[in-house]
Amino acid sequence: MEQVTKNVYAETKVRGCNPVYVVTSAGVVIIDTPQLPTYAVRMRKEAESHGQIKYLINTEHHVDHIFGNYYFRGAGIVVAHAETAANFKVVTPEINPYEYA
């Protein structure tokens, strides 16, 4: 992760989504998660080194934004549009996660 401002860190060298975490006085906010397991595990470890993860925000339903959520289980409240899960299931009803990892 690259530090882009004092409290904002982003994954800038991956194709697709650029996951971010923001360090606040109340805790850490994750914005989207990496789809690759190794990146997701590393992001969580780095983010937690700055404090407790309070929120995980998913900006959309595409796999490059949400697949890493699995590696953030129990790490704060997940925030997303009400249709995110429904859209994911409609667009990719029989997705093979190994095609994206």
Q: Locations of the language-model features?
A:
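Conserved beta-strand hairpin/beta-sheet module of binuclear metal-dependent hydrolase folds
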Residues: E2-E48
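Active-site HxH/HxHxD metal-binding segment of metal-dependent hydrolases
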Residues: K45-A101
